[in-house]
Amino acid sequence: VIDSLTLSLQQREAQQLVEPTGWARVDRNIDKIVQALANAKNEEDYQAVGLLCREAIISLAQAVYDPNLHPSLDEVNPSKTDAKRMLEDYIATQLLGGSNESLRKYVKDAYQLTVTLQHKRNANFRETALCVEATRSLVNAIAIISGQRDPYIDF
Protein backbone atom coordinates (compact mmCIF):
# COMPACT_ATOMS: atom_id res chain seq x y z
CA VAL A 1 0.00 0.00 0.00
CA ILE A 2 2.78 2.45 0.92
CA ASP A 3 4.72 1.65 -2.25
CA SER A 4 1.64 2.21 -4.40
CA LEU A 5 0.96 5.51 -2.60
CA THR A 6 4.54 6.63 -3.16
CA LEU A 7 4.40 5.62 -6.83
CA SER A 8 1.09 7.43 -7.26
CA LEU A 9 2.52 10.61 -5.71
CA GLN A 10 5.63 10.39 -7.87
CA GLN A 11 3.60 9.98 -11.05
CA ARG A 12 1.24 12.80 -10.14
CA GLU A 13 4.20 15.08 -9.42
CA ALA A 14 5.75 14.30 -12.80
CA GLN A 15 2.48 14.95 -14.59
CA GLN A 16 1.82 18.36 -13.05
CA LEU A 17 2.18 21.11 -15.58
CA VAL A 18 5.00 23.47 -14.80
CA GLU A 19 4.43 26.99 -16.04
CA PRO A 20 7.61 28.29 -17.66
CA THR A 21 9.24 31.33 -16.09
CA GLY A 22 10.83 32.60 -19.28
CA TRP A 23 14.28 31.96 -17.82
CA ALA A 24 15.41 29.05 -20.00
CA ARG A 25 17.97 27.60 -17.62
CA VAL A 26 15.61 27.78 -14.64
CA ASP A 27 12.84 26.15 -16.67
CA ARG A 28 15.15 23.34 -17.80
CA ASN A 29 16.26 22.78 -14.20
CA ILE A 30 12.67 22.56 -12.98
CA ASP A 31 11.78 20.08 -15.73
CA LYS A 32 14.79 17.93 -14.75
CA ILE A 33 13.84 18.12 -11.07
CA VAL A 34 10.29 16.92 -11.70
CA GLN A 35 11.50 14.02 -13.84
CA ALA A 36 14.28 13.09 -11.40
CA LEU A 37 11.81 12.99 -8.50
CA ALA A 38 9.46 10.78 -10.51
CA ASN A 39 12.31 8.34 -11.17
CA ALA A 40 14.02 8.47 -7.74
CA LYS A 41 14.18 5.17 -5.87
CA ASN A 42 16.84 5.47 -3.16
CA GLU A 43 18.73 7.93 -0.95
CA GLU A 44 21.33 8.70 -3.62
CA ASP A 45 18.59 9.49 -6.14
CA TYR A 46 16.87 11.77 -3.63
CA GLN A 47 20.15 13.55 -2.90
CA ALA A 48 20.64 14.05 -6.65
CA VAL A 49 17.22 15.72 -6.79
CA GLY A 50 18.36 18.02 -3.98
CA LEU A 51 21.45 18.94 -5.97
CA LEU A 52 19.26 19.78 -8.97
CA CYS A 53 17.16 21.99 -6.69
CA ARG A 54 20.32 23.80 -5.60
CA GLU A 55 21.32 24.34 -9.24
CA ALA A 56 17.85 25.68 -10.05
CA ILE A 57 18.11 28.20 -7.21
CA ILE A 58 21.55 29.33 -8.36
CA SER A 59 20.20 29.77 -11.90
CA LEU A 60 17.21 31.67 -10.53
CA ALA A 61 19.44 34.02 -8.53
CA GLN A 62 21.66 34.62 -11.56
CA ALA A 63 18.58 35.39 -13.68
CA VAL A 64 17.28 38.18 -11.43
CA TYR A 65 20.28 39.58 -9.60
CA ASP A 66 22.03 42.65 -10.95
CA PRO A 67 24.75 44.11 -8.71
CA ASN A 68 24.05 47.58 -10.13
CA LEU A 69 20.38 47.39 -9.10
CA HIS A 70 20.58 45.21 -5.99
CA PRO A 71 23.23 46.52 -3.59
CA SER A 72 24.71 44.16 -1.04
CA LEU A 73 23.06 44.15 2.37
CA ASP A 74 26.26 43.14 4.14
CA GLU A 75 28.78 44.85 1.83
CA VAL A 76 29.96 41.47 0.53
CA ASN A 77 29.67 41.05 -3.21
CA PRO A 78 28.12 37.65 -3.89
CA SER A 79 30.01 35.13 -5.98
CA LYS A 80 28.35 33.76 -9.12
CA THR A 81 27.05 30.78 -7.13
CA ASP A 82 26.07 32.58 -3.91
CA ALA A 83 22.34 32.26 -4.44
CA LYS A 84 21.53 33.18 -0.84
CA ARG A 85 23.18 36.61 -1.00
CA MET A 86 21.96 37.32 -4.52
CA LEU A 87 18.36 36.50 -3.62
CA GLU A 88 18.52 38.37 -0.31
CA ASP A 89 19.85 41.48 -2.07
CA TYR A 90 17.25 41.09 -4.81
CA ILE A 91 14.23 40.77 -2.52
CA ALA A 92 15.48 43.52 -0.20
CA THR A 93 15.43 45.87 -3.19
CA GLN A 94 12.27 44.59 -4.85
CA LEU A 95 10.19 44.26 -1.67
CA LEU A 96 10.97 47.43 0.24
CA GLY A 97 9.14 48.58 3.33
CA GLY A 98 7.43 47.14 6.37
CA SER A 99 4.32 46.16 4.45
CA ASN A 100 6.40 43.63 2.49
CA GLU A 101 8.05 42.02 5.53
CA SER A 102 5.88 38.89 5.33
CA LEU A 103 6.68 38.52 1.62
CA ARG A 104 10.42 38.83 2.28
CA LYS A 105 10.10 36.27 5.08
CA TYR A 106 8.19 33.88 2.80
CA VAL A 107 10.90 33.99 0.14
CA LYS A 108 13.66 33.55 2.73
CA ASP A 109 11.82 30.65 4.39
CA ALA A 110 11.22 28.89 1.06
CA TYR A 111 14.93 29.22 0.31
CA GLN A 112 15.93 27.96 3.76
CA LEU A 113 13.58 24.96 3.55
CA THR A 114 15.06 23.99 0.20
CA VAL A 115 18.63 24.25 1.49
CA THR A 116 17.85 22.32 4.67
CA LEU A 117 16.11 19.48 2.87
CA GLN A 118 18.68 19.14 0.10
CA HIS A 119 21.46 18.46 2.61
CA LYS A 120 19.77 15.46 4.25
CA ARG A 121 21.93 12.41 3.60
CA ASN A 122 19.13 10.02 4.47
CA ALA A 123 16.46 11.79 2.43
CA ASN A 124 13.32 9.92 1.50
CA PHE A 125 10.62 10.57 -1.06
CA ARG A 126 8.49 12.84 1.13
CA GLU A 127 11.38 15.04 2.21
CA THR A 128 12.62 15.25 -1.36
CA ALA A 129 9.13 16.07 -2.64
CA LEU A 130 8.99 18.89 -0.06
CA CYS A 131 12.36 20.13 -1.27
CA VAL A 132 11.05 20.13 -4.84
CA GLU A 133 7.91 22.02 -3.83
CA ALA A 134 9.92 24.56 -1.83
CA THR A 135 12.17 25.09 -4.85
CA ARG A 136 9.22 25.49 -7.18
CA SER A 137 7.55 27.84 -4.70
CA LEU A 138 10.69 29.96 -4.52
CA VAL A 139 11.01 30.03 -8.32
CA ASN A 140 7.37 31.00 -8.74
CA ALA A 141 7.53 33.65 -6.01
CA ILE A 142 10.56 35.28 -7.63
CA ALA A 143 8.90 35.01 -11.05
CA ILE A 144 5.87 36.86 -9.68
CA ILE A 145 8.00 39.49 -7.91
CA SER A 146 10.04 40.08 -11.07
CA GLY A 147 6.96 40.50 -13.27
CA GLN A 148 7.53 37.27 -15.22
CA ARG A 149 4.01 36.12 -14.28
CA ASP A 150 2.27 39.40 -15.14
CA PRO A 151 -0.52 38.92 -17.68
CA TYR A 152 0.28 40.01 -21.18
CA ILE A 153 -1.88 42.96 -22.18
CA ASP A 154 -2.18 43.69 -25.88
CA PHE A 155 -3.10 47.31 -26.55
Q: Which sequence ranges carry the predicted segments?
A:
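Internal, Lys/Arg-enriched amphipathic helical interaction segments that engage polyanionic partners
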Residues: 1-28, 32
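Short, solvent-exposed segments of well-ordered alpha helices
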Residues: 17-24, 40-51, 101, 105, ...
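Short, hydrophobic, well-ordered secondary-structure elements
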Residues: 27, 31-34, 45-66, 135-136
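Solvent-exposed, amphipathic alpha-helical segments
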Residues: 28-39, 110-120
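Short, flexible helix-adjacent loops and helix caps
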Residues: 35-42, 65, 69, 119-123, ...
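Surface-exposed interaction patch
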Residues: 62-79
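Long, charged low-complexity segments
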Residues: 75-150
